[in-house]
């Protein structure tokens, strides 16, 4: 049985609210199995821990949670300049030479495609049940920000995008229940893939996740294509558990020179390329 590390920042109202719902749902009691944590609880197949640091700086997770934890799910807020109401999942890393929001430059964390796909599906179902599917966008986000130096697969699940949404107890309930439903039935089958192209909310890739059962690891948005290289593509593939054998490219907005890099890479690597 896999043990999941459910982690959050105690300073984040979204993550804190989700964690409080999980604690009350299970009637959890405090534990001392975590190191340097503000809060720590143990469930049947998970450890729930809150830390004082912001989530983008959670590179320390391997040293603070028990060794038996095999994957991480980070409960978090999501900020958007356009103030889009959203429930999102994504993986972490920096494609370019700078890392202004945590992690290291040109480094990706290990993606968690099966877990994030099931969470995405759960979010969609719950948003429908709670009557928020028209108001809130349920979507993948492209890979961005830290942490990057965690040695186990990790993904974020987030509430966006302003303090009003972060503090909304209904949002806490919806996103916490998406995690709870996963924990209670983590078995899931889907087709692991890597994504290239699209916006920060890659709607075509999200559509493929629902329609073709593709579970995405890293997604490189159109705005990051200036950093595309065979080395970055290899990082996107190998930094995923399980490792995908298919790259999905949103053709519109992906320039010819970028498509050539991808086409040569898949030819050398022997994996499938699909344009959408």
Curated annotation (Swiss-Prot):
Record's keyword annotation contains Cell membrane: no
Keywords: Hydrolase, Metal-binding, Zinc
UniProt remark on cofactor binding: Binds 2 Zn(2+) ions per subunit.
UniProt keyword Kinase, yes or no: no
Enzyme class: hydrolase
Cofactors that this protein relies on: Zn(2+)
Tree of life domain: Archaea
InterPro entries hit by this protein: Deacylase_DtdA_archaea, DtdA
GO biological process: D-amino acid catabolic process
GO molecular function term, any single one: zinc ion binding
Reaction equations catalysed: a D-aminoacyl-tRNA + H2O = a tRNA + a D-alpha-amino acid + H(+); glycyl-tRNA(Ala) + H2O = tRNA(Ala) + glycine + H(+)
E.C. no: 3.1.1.96
Record family assignment: Belongs to the DtdA deacylase family.
Stated role: D-aminoacyl-tRNA deacylase with broad substrate specificity. By recycling D-aminoacyl-tRNA to D-amino acids and free tRNA molecules, this enzyme counteracts the toxicity associated with the formation of D-aminoacyl-tRNA entities in vivo.
NCBIfam families, A to Z: PRK03995.1-4 (NF003072)
Known partners and oligomeric status: Monomer.
Protein name: D-aminoacyl-tRNA deacylase
Species classification: Archaea, Thermoproteota, Thermoprotei, Desulfurococcales, Desulfurococcaceae
